[in-house]
């Protein structure tokens, strides 16, 4: 769990979601059951007023929620509840108070691909999750490169191979779904179980690819995964839409065949950066 806490910090490129600085630390104390050093994560303390469970979700900035949603989706977060979203309130004499969300507790991120049954996102119940991503968030997602992040991580920690595979798959999934016009809520529908006994669409997709080894052949796995994901998204959301803001409110635009054809293969983009 400690290593995954650090991986979440590295994955939050440019502190887009505001994950606090996190590092690994060894600790030893005479009161411990064992005299051996213990490894844990050490995270900068973030002063805060409360957590998201103490406030109405409509108070939060849309881009803040979307940035955290993108991080959670990439990491297949299995413990995102309102209690581990800290709320900071900034006050100014000239401006009304502003609320900022700070996500913590990422030890249950990046599960093995075969064990994603506990993926959960509190923000799926928030209205912001059903709104389209801004141009800023879209540009950020487009710039993500999990292979470059892997190299950066390896300079400081030893990330587990299975956690890295999940990061690569999650990054591809996020980039592909954002390009296809899905909202954070719709992506959540792909990853989160609708009932305890029913596997999520993502779990079913991974099960279909069990003949492939993502840990020793990640490049091949990503190529096959992208094709399967494309089919899954089109089946679940047959009229994949783009939502734009018009003068009279939110309107829906259907993508043209040319737009569908022009969409990139994000597996190729990721893999070219790893070459």
Task: Give each language-model segment a name.
Residues 1-78, 82-275:
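ATP-dependent kinase catalytic cores of phosphoinositide-metabolizing enzymes
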């Amino acid at each position: 769990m400690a290593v995954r806490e650090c991986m979440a910090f590295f994955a939050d490129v440019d502190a887009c979601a505001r994950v606090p600085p996190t590092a690994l630390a060894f600790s030893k104390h005479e009161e411990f059951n064992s005299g051996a050093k213990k490894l844990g994560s050490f995270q900068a303390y973030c002063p805060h007023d409360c957590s998201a469970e103490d406030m109405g979700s409509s108070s939060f900035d849309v881009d803040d929620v979307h940035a955290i949603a993108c991080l959670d989706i990439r990491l297949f977060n299995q413990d995102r509840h309102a209690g581990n979203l800290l709320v900071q309130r900034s006050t100014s004499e000239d401006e009304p108070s502003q609320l900022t969300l700070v996500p913590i507790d990422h030890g249950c991120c990046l599960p093995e691909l075969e064990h994603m049954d506990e993926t959960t996102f509190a923000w799926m119940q928030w209205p912001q999750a059903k709104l389209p991503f801004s141009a800023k968030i879209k540009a950020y997602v487009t710039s993500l490169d999990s292979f470059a992040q892997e190299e950066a991580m390896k300079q400081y920690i030893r990330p587990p191979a299975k956690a890295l595979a999940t990061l690569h798959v999650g990054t591809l999934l996020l980039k592909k779904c954002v390009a296809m016009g899905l909202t954070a809520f719709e992506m959540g529908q792909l990853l989160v179980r609708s009932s305890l006994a029913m596997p999520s669409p993502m779990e079913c997709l991974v099960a279909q690819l069990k003949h492939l080894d993502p840990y020793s052949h990640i490049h091949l796995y990503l190529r096959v995964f992208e094709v399967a994901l494309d089919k899954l998204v089109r089946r679940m959301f047959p009229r994949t839409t783009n939502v734009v803001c018009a003068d009279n409110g939110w309107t829906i635009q259907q993508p043209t065949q040319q737009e569908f054809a022009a969409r990139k293969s994000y597996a190729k983009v990721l893999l070219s950066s790893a070459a």
